[in-house]
Amino acid sequence: LITPLRICKTNEPADYRITSPDKWQYKRCIIGKKFSNSVGVSGILIEPTSQYIDLTFETMSRYGEDVGFNTLRLFHATSNHFPQLIPAITPEGLETFTPQPGETCYRWTHTQNTIQLQGANSYKEESAAIYGASLENGESGIIVHTIGNNSATYECYNRVEEYGKKIAPLAPHLVIISLGTNESV
């Protein structure tokens, strides 16, 4: 699971990047006044402030390994008015489908390290809320999803409405709760 942390004005890991030339509103699951319980599985959400959506998802190698993907699972608002986002450059063999409400899946033939999704947003911001994405390559192995926010605690995630249902699309076989620095305050 990758989340648009940089768009939310917080630290983002060095092995992926989610960027946009546009401005976004954001909400985070954190301690204090800025707490929002309307966030998705990632503990954050971004909402477009313009009539157009332009997001780029990119993986970056830290040690020279191939980190390409040929599947992007986009987690978003379950609204019937979520905008149709399409790749700026259509990858070979592209299939787009919605396996369940709140998830749009893009799958194509060959792995690549970046994909740019674009589309018109003709409804209200909350109809187009985006929570994060899973980038997958179809190879066997372990898929690890991590969820975390600066200034978030277990109690914050526990207050998010129907959080267990929001994790369900990830189909976890094991959930590990690792309490960190935020729990010590």
Residues covered by each model-derived region:
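Conserved SGNH/GDSL esterase-like catalytic core that processes O-acyl groups on lipids
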Residues: 2-88, 95-185
